[in-house]
Amino acid sequence: MEGMFMSEYVKVAVDAMGGDNAPGEIVKGAVEAVNESSKVKVCLVGIPDAVEKELAGYTYNKEQIEVVPASEVIETAEPPVMAIRKKKDSSIVKALNLVKSGECDAYVSAGSTGATLVGGQVIVGRIKGVERPPLAPLIPTEKGCALLIDCGANVDARPSHLVQFAKMGSVYMENIMGVKNPKVGIVNIGAEEEKGNALVKETFPLLKNCPDINFVGSVEARDIPAGAVDVVVCEAFVGNVILKTYEGVGLTLIKKVKAGMMSSLRSKVGALLVKPALKSTLKEFDLEQYGGAPMLGLKGLVVKTHGSSKANEIKNSILQCIAFSEQKINEKIKEKLGMEELIADEAK
């Protein structure tokens, strides 16, 4: 499976029953993805009647979408480990097993984050040598975007884990986003090397002495939106706080701007003049454009989208899998982590 993506299509197993807007928005996103790209085939895993009812309203290439039956759904509130073990016919478990078996190359879900993270490791499995697979979403910055790694998978990370995060994040930004020699920073409470908690203090010299990444030192949270670094390294608790703050501030800002523009006749007239520029700017800070967060370091690509995902984010998450395939990210991660001998063995 680690030598994946050899078929005519990049095959993506999509959890059709996961998320607040399933199956409607999930199916719509899948249709939009195949209508936009002839390189992808989607396996919609879910309750057939519900999925096929949604599909009936769309026009698409029938060869590019397949419905894979699943009779169960893992709810967000369920304990992830227990749910993965007990609900073998759930849309999440069946979709992940499609990746494990090699029938599909990638997995996308807006469903239970815990079940996806647990299932990714237990079912799909880690690349040999990867200590902890991180969840790594793209976040908007003044200069484009940055990769936030980790944002939810490893709360109790070790220094060696963060070093691997930095390397995997560098591979992703360079090959998927086209950033040459991406700048790597570790989240800290100050720019000085001696600052930070025990984890940061222990990790800093390891990153500093790592020859195959462009480590620029500590990055404070306020400098992340300015684009100070391309790869934002942190353990999952810190990363999740950063991500949720990003989302919350963005929503609040949009509400405040809209309220201000409608507060008087003068502001309404002014709003008409600035609307095109404002709309363009706000679009740059829309997280949906990037799709979901990849879980790097697994044998197959696992992508987790927001639970509230609409069709556009699902579509972009599916299309993200094509770039992952074409750029051979897993092979490059192995190279970055010093696993050239593993690649040679698999090529025999």
What is the role of each PLM region?
Residues 24-25, 37, 41-43, 49, ...:
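Glycine-rich phosphate/diphosphate-binding loop of Rossmann-like nucleotide-binding domains
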Residues 121-134, 138-148, 228-232, 236-346:
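Glycine-rich phosphate/nucleotide-binding loop
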Residues 5-52:
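N-terminal phosphate-binding or glycine-rich loops at protein starts, especially the Walker A/P-loop
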Residues 15, 44-46, 68, 109-111, ...:
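Short beta-strand segments
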Residues 3-8, 15, 35-36, 59-60, ...:
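Solvent-exposed alpha-helices and their adjacent loops that cap or buttress functional pockets
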Residues 22-26, 89-102, 106-120, 127, ...:
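Short glycine/serine/threonine-rich phosphate/pyrophosphate-binding segments
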Residues 60-104:
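Phosphate/nucleotide-donor binding subsite
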